[in-house]
Design a protein with these regions (language model features):
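Membrane-interface soluble catalytic domains
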Residues: 27, 298, 308, 484-488
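Generic recognition of cysteine residues
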Residues: 40, 117, 127, 149, ...
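Pol beta-like nucleotidyltransferase catalytic core
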Residues: 333-377, 387-488
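A positional/structural detector of protein chain ends, strongest at the extreme C-terminus
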Residues: 1-3, 487-488
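Conserved catalytic core of two-metal-ion nucleotidyltransferases
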Residues: 154-201, 209-359, 369, 375-389, ...
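Composition-driven detection of intrinsically disordered, low-complexity segments
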Residues: 7, 15-20, 70, 299, ...
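N-terminal regions immediately upstream of nucleotidyltransferase
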Residues: 2-10, 17-203, 207-263, 267-270
Length: 488
């Protein structure tokens, strides 16, 4: 949802973005008490509470409070250990929580939004086992990272080298046929520029094109997540390196370039030295290669845009959120963005002529820059490993990019660097998993820089519902039994 208002007489508009499906940065930004209750009593909570949970309303009626207290009392009766595990990641409330005979007598004050404190404070007086439980979770997460995540990284690195050998050979053949498509796939600091890991068996290689200079970048917001390239002057048409791909209206067509590139790659596959192990993926307008019947690589022509920032992302960073700092913002915007020749669809699922000519915005380098420092990348690595092992579901509702997006939102909700110390890894992971459940229930996951773009668009509702249930089971297991990470 967005609200716009005119500022003065200049016609400038201020965009205020409200990210539905994500917790807004209001006074009570994280009602983790209710979310944690949901992890243990998801099916038994009332429909009304479920609705409130999905909408993240900060204020609750007396009846809601009664239901919550009743469930808390039942929970305390069942197990003091579970109570400790639930209250461990919560933030300080000005509350009197008394554990007597393994029963929770009163937590009414814990539901008071005015008592919320943004900074996590671990007070042994509130819950004696809280610090020990947190340390235990961090210990098992670090063990999981060192054993599972590092082995995953090593395996993927080996796969990337194998895949890039094949792709490089194919692109060399393309370049021989058409010198305008020059291979930009190169290794730098043990990573390949322009390569993105979608999953351990799926990759995307961005092929950067030259000479975008005679085109203007037009980003009017009519196509969420997309923009067009229009000739700056009709008289410059013949000066463009890509003259045959310019439409009658003066737009550089992403579809036409992709179609030409697909033809070239198909010819190159038949001529390259790896022709016995690589073949084109049929029934798609995208350029995809299947290598050794195990890996799929999408090769996408693109323009790299530096020194400018899209108008559809002009609201970022949000003025009331202190993260990231001015220096980091400058670095991120200096990284710029890419314009990818990929398919983009409107809400009705059909591609219009305007969309076929449009280019998809991508912020890969800017997003990587945001996640520098603290345990951010470690947290993302754990999430990716958990996704690969437990959330690779029918309909493919979740991918690594969803996890990356939620880590960025978590950084906004916890802007201080101290919030990302190694000893906070458990809290951050727990918060992101809870947020993922919320997004799946709401069937909406806004793009971090382009909140009008829903990353769940086109995903089957049944697949999202199934993913929400599986994520709930996973989060509950980690929350109540950190040692279970040894088997996850």
């Amino acid at each position: 949802m967005e609200r716009r208002r005119d500022r003065g007489g200049e016609g400038q508009k201020e965009q205020v973005v409200r990210r539905e499906g994500l917790m807004s940065n209001e006074r009570l930004t994280r009602p983790q008490l209710i979310l944690s209750l949901y992890l243990c009593f998801g099916a038994s909570l009332s429909t009304k509470l479920m609705d409130r949970l999905a909408k993240h309303r900060a204020n609750f009626s007396p009846h809601d409070k009664y239901l919550l207290l009743n469930h808390l009392d039942k929970l305390a009766s069942k197990s003091k250990l579970i109570v400790d595990s639930i209250f461990r990641p919560l933030y300080r409330f000005k509350a009197a929580m008394i554990l007597r005979s393994q029963r929770l007598i009163s937590v009414t004050a814990a539901l008071d939004p005015s008592a919320y404190c943004e900074t996590p404070v671990y007070n042994p007086d509130l819950c004696p086992n809280m610090i020990a439980a947190q340390a235990k979770l961090v210990y098992h997460l670090n063990k999981y990272y060192n054993e599972k995540c590092q082995s995953r990284k090593a395996a993927i690195s080996k796969t990337i080298r194998e895949v890039c050998k094949v792709v490089s050979d194919v692109l060399k053949e393309v370049e021989v046929q058409e010198p305008r498509f020059i291979s930009s796939l190169s290794e730098m600091d043990n990573r390949f520029e322009g390569l993105e890991v979608i999953s351990p068996t799926e990759f995307e290689v961005v092929l950067y094109l030259n000479q975008m200079g005679v085109f203007n970048f037009v980003d009017d917001g009519s196509l969420p997540g997309c923009a067009v390239l229009k000739l700056s002057d009709g008289r410059k048409r013949s000066m463009s390196l890509w003259v045959e791909f310019i439409t009658a209206s003066g737009y550089l067509s992403a579809r036409k370039i992709r179609s030409r590139f697909q033809t070239l790659v198909a010819q190159a596959v038949d001529k390259c030295s790896y022709r016995d192990v690589v073949k084109m993926v049929a029934d798609t307008s995208e350029v995809k290669l299947r290598i050794r019947d195990r890996y799929v690589v999408q090769i996408t022509p693109a323009f790299k845009c530096t020194g400018i920032w899209p108008r559809s992302a002009a609201h970022w960073p949000l003025p009331h959120i202190p993260w990231p700092g001015p220096n980091r913002v400058a670095e991120v915007k200096a990284e710029g963005f890419n314009l990818l020749s990929k398919e983009c669809y409107s809400l009705n699922g059909k591609q219009s002529s305007a969309e076929s000519d449009a280019w998809v915005l991508q912020f890969a380098e800017a997003e990587n820059r945001l996640l520098l420092g603290g345990c951010r990348k470690k947290c993302l690595s754990v999430l990716k490993a958990l996704r690969d092992r437990h959330l690779e579901l029918p309909g493919q509702p979740l991918n690594n990019y969803h996890m990356k997006t939620l880590v960025s939102y978590e950084c906004e909700k916890h802007p201080r660097e101290s919030d990302w110390d190694e000893n906070c890894l458990g809290d951050r992971l727990n918060g992101i998993l809870l947020q993922l459940i919320s997004c799946l229930q709401c069937r909406r996951c806004p793009h971090y820089f382009l909140p009008n773009l829903d990353l769940f668009q086109g995903k089957p509702h049944s697949a999202l519902e199934n993913a929400a249930k599986q994520t709930w089971r996973l989060a509950r297991e980690i929350l109540t039994n950190p040692k279970s990470l040894e088997k996850l």
